[in-house]
Amino acid sequence: MKVRASIKRICRECKLIKRHGVNRIICVNPKHKQRQG
């Protein structure tokens, strides 16, 4: 899980979702997981 100020999709499988007011990226590739914070 990478925590970044600005998150962006790395590949086409990455999906941007909002959970409890926190933006996250989930993907089939675990290396692409990101959270905005």
Swiss-Prot record:
Keyword Acetylation assigned to the entry: answer is no
- On whether Transit peptide is a keyword of this UniProt record, the answer is no
Keywords annotated in UniProt? Ribonucleoprotein, Ribosomal protein
What PROSITE patterns does its record include? RIBOSOMAL_L36
- Record-level GO BP terms: translation
Which InterPro entries does the protein's record reference?
A: Ribosomal_bL36, Ribosomal_bL36_sp
Task: Please give the GO cellular component terms listed in this UniProt entry.
Answer: cytoplasm; ribonucleoprotein complex; ribosome
Gene Ontology MF, one? structural constituent of ribosome
Family note? Belongs to the bacterial ribosomal protein bL36 family.
Q: What is this protein called?
A: Large ribosomal subunit protein bL36
| Organism of provenance | Metamycoplasma arthritidis (strain 158L3-1) (Mycoplasma arthritidis)
